[in-house]
């Protein structure tokens, strides 16, 4: 089985690493463009269950995470107004990690095959005879041509964004 993943992003890198572990051939096809990843300071949080899954499937992730037992979400307008709190006794709720470190860890797999195309279209990709094509890149020409105008958009969605402010903790490892 040959699978094509469109986009050089964290979603595809994690998926590719797991598929390769199951002996499935994977190509990551992407368009060359200047990457802003090198300078990103993004931190992401993953749930306890997702961390367990990644730890079982990806070597070295344990060294990248900071477990958290409690996270409080505050209002942006009134910083003393707590909206809600996630906490579990004796168990980590989330694991924080730097996006770029996880991205670089995923990219280290020597079995990954990256195909950089200046301009790609569906016909070029079909010629490669993939069993399955997965597109996780929202701003590529294929998405724009075949899906953007056909998908009904509903912007009545809710997203939580947070800036975490905490006291510095000295690791004695």
Q: Which residue stretches match the model-derived regions?
A:
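Short beta-strand/turn micro-motifs composed of small residues
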Residues: 7, 30-32, 75, 135, ...
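A generic structural signal for short, well-ordered alpha-helical segments in conserved domains
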Residues: 16-17, 107
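N-terminal FAD cofactor-binding segment of flavoenzymes
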Residues: 38-76
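N-terminal Rossmann-fold NAD(P) dinucleotide-binding loop
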Residues: 12-13
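Receiver (REC) domain switch-region micro-motif
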Residues: 3-4, 133
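Flavin-dependent oxidoreductases
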Residues: 158-173
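Conserved N-terminal helical subregion
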Residues: 56, 66-147, 152-160
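Glycine-rich FAD pyrophosphate-binding loop
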Residues: 4-8, 17-42
């Amino acid at each position: 089985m040959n699978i094509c993943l469109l986009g050089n992003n964290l979603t595809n890198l994690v998926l590719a690493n797991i598929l390769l572990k199951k002996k499935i051939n994977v190509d990551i096809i992407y368009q060359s463009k200047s990457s802003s990843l090198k300078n990103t300071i993004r931190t992401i949080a993953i749930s306890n269950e997702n961390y367990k899954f990644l730890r079982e499937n990806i070597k070295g992730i344990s060294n990248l995470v900071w477990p958290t037992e409690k996270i409080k979400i505050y209002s942006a307008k009134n910083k003393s107004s707590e909206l809600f709190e996630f906490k579990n006794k004796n168990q980590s709720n989330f694991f924080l990690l730097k996006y770029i470190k996880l991205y670089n860890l995923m990219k280290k797999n020597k079995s990954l095959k990256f195909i950089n195309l200046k301009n790609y279209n569906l016909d070029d990709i079909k010629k490669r005879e993939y069993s399955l094509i997965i597109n996780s890149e929202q701003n590529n020409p294929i998405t724009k041509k075949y899906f953007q105008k056909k998908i009904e958009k509903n912007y009545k969605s809710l997203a939580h964004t947070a800036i975490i402010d905490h006291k510095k903790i000295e690791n004695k490892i």
